[in-house]
C-alpha cells in the first residue's frame, strides 16, 4: 500500500469515528478518567451472588471495561497472555483451547476451562476437536471479564476442572439514550498490511421499564504469511527415489515455482442485542441474542526447520506445498438466551437461565505431504504412484471444477486443481437450563440450591479426498455424530461465625449419558490400508463404509469446602478444598478389530497398521525385535474396547487444595493477593497415537503445585502499576504402559512461569482534557507439546516431544482524552517478537516430520479513535 493510501485510510478512520458508528475495544464506556487516590472496588458474581472481588475467597483475575480499554485489548486470546496460570493451545482465530494450573486438555472431548457468556456455558463436551474450541468473542462492550482459578465444578460443572472464564456483557440502561463507537486502522509489519476494525453500541430506552442495547462489530486483518509451491518431485519423504528428492532436512531448498502472499488474512463480524424489561423491583427479564461469523484463508502457521527439540522458522517463512492447496477456515456461532430474575421475598431470589446455541465450522488443510508418505507409501514404484509423483501420466488431473476444493491451484505442469486436501466440518447444538434459588439477605446464613440440564448434539465430519482419476477416490471420510444428556443438582451453604470466620460447603451431583455413532470409509481407513499394503488396491468406492456405535453413562459428586478468616477490613486468609471433573467418552474405532481378515496380523503384528487395527499398543519399556517385527511380550491391549472395536475412556478428576490471602494497604492504594495450591490429577485423559491415528486413554496420575500472585498500586503523580504472575510445577507419577509418558515428565503445554506487568499514566491538561499512556509486557515460559500424542512404539518420548520457546510481548499505547473523545496511537508487539506458539493440529494422518507451527502477529501499529455520547 502506498503512503497516500495509508493517509487516506487514517482519514477515513477519523471520519467514521466522529460519526459514532465505529468500534470500541472494550465496553462502550471510555477508559476510566484520571485515577483517584484509591484503587477502584470491583463487584463480581463469581459465586453467583454479588460480592467485592477482594472479599471473595477465590483466586481470580478480573479485568473491567476500563482495564480492557486502557490496554487496547480486542480479543480474549490477547487478554489471556497476561493471566497467571492460564495457557493456550491455538490453531488460529476461533480455534483455541484454554488450560489452567497445569491441567492439559490434549486428550478427551472436553475443555479444562469453562467459558461462559454471562451465565450460559459455551464450552461444550463435544466429540473430537470441537469440544475444546472456544469462540473468541470480541471484547467490545463487555462490562468485565472474570477468570476464576482452580476447580469450579460445584457451581459451574464438568468443563471447569482447571478454572472458569466469565465474559459479562454490559447490560441495557433504563431511561438513558447512549451511543458509542470506535474505528481502528493499523498496519502489520513483516509481510502484513492494513487492518481495519469498527464497532458500535446504541442503548435505546423504552420508557422507565425497558431498554435495548445493540452492539455490532466488523474487522478485517491482513495476512502476513506466504504459501510456496515447490517444483515437481519435492516430496517430503525419507524413502522417495525420485531425482531430485527433497527430504525434510533440506526440503526448504527445493525450487519455488509459485508464491501466494498474505494467505492468512481473516475477517470477523458480530452482533449482540440485549433487552432488559423490569416492570417492578421484583422482576427483571433479559433476553439476549448473539451472532458471530469468522472466516480466514489459511491458519497462522509456518513450516519449521530442525528437530522437534530445536525448531526454527525457515527463510522465507510460510507454508511449503507440493502444489497449491487453499486452506480456508470458517466459523459461525449463534446464541439465544433468556434470563429471568424474580424476588420471591425480600430475602430470597429465583433465577432462570435458558440457553440455546449452535456452532458451524469448517477447517481445511493441505494433505499432500501426509497422503504422500503415510505408512511407507512415499516410495516410487509402490502400489500408489500418486504418493510420490503427482505428474504421473497414468493418473491425470481432473478438471478444476471437479477437484472439490475450488480449483484455481497450481499443479506440477502449470495451472490446475488444488491438491489433495483435508476438511473437518463440525456442527454443535446445545440446549441448557439452569434454575437457582438463593438467599439475598445480609444475615450470617447464605445458601443457594440449583438444577442444571444440558442436551448437546455434535456432528464431526472429516473428508480427505484425492483429486486424481486414479484408483483412489475417497482417501478417508468419517462421520461421527454424538449426543450428550446431563442433569445436575448443586448447592452451597455458608455461615459467618464471630471474629471474622466464615465456613462454606458445597456439592454438585451429576449424571450424564452419551451415545456416538461412527461411519468411515476410504483407502486410508485401517482396513483399507490392509488391502493396499497387500498389493491389491481397490477401485474407489469398493471399500464399504464401516459402521460402529458406542455409549455410556456415569454419575458422581463434586464437593467444595472453604474456610475464610477476615482478619480486618483489609486482610483475609482462606483455605479451599475442591474437586473437579470432566466427562468420559469414546474414540474412533479400530477398523480391523476382531475382523477375520486381520486375525493373522493381530497374532503376529509386523507393522504400525497392524497395531492400530488390532487395538494393540507398544509398551514404553519394550523394544521391537529385528526385521521390523513387534515383540508380542511388549504389546498391551488397548483398554476399554467394546465388541465393535470402539475404545472408550472414563472421566478424569482433580482434587485441589489451596491456601490464599487477599490484602489491601495504604488506605486502599495498593493490594497484594497470593495463592498457593496443590492438585492431584487422577486418571488423566491423555492423547496417544497409533499409526498416525489419535486416541484418548486414561493415563497415570500427576501432581501439580504452584503459586499465583497479583499486585496493584496507585503510585501517585498519575501512575498506576499492576502485575500478575503464576508458577506451575507438574509431573507424572508413574511409567504408564498406556499413555507412554514417563514418570517425572511434566504435563504438556504447561509453562512454569506466566505473567504480565502493566504501567498506566494519566495527566490532566484541563478540566475536561488529559493525556494517557499504557505499557504492558506479557510473558509465557517455555513448554513442550505432544500434538500427535505419544507414539509409544517409538520407545522414546523425545521423538514426538515438540519444544516451544518462552516469549515476551510488549504493547504500547498513548493518546488524548476528552469527555467524549479518545484518540490513541498504539504499537502491539513493539519488539516484533515472532515466536512459535503451538504446533498446528493435523486433522489428517498425524506425521511428526510435517509439523507446522502457529505463530503470533508481527509488530502492528495504528490509530484508535473513539466517541461516546450519553449512557455508560
Go through each PLM region and give its residues.
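Solvent-exposed loop segments that connect transmembrane elements
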Residues: 224-262, 297-324, 366-423, 463-479, ...
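Short acidic/polar hinge/loop motifs at secondary-structure boundaries
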Residues: 120-149, 198-200
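C-terminal beta-signal and adjacent terminal beta-strands/loops
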Residues: 778-790, 815-872
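Extracytoplasmic beta-strand/coil segments of soluble accessory domains associated
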Residues: 45, 77, 81-124, 143, ...
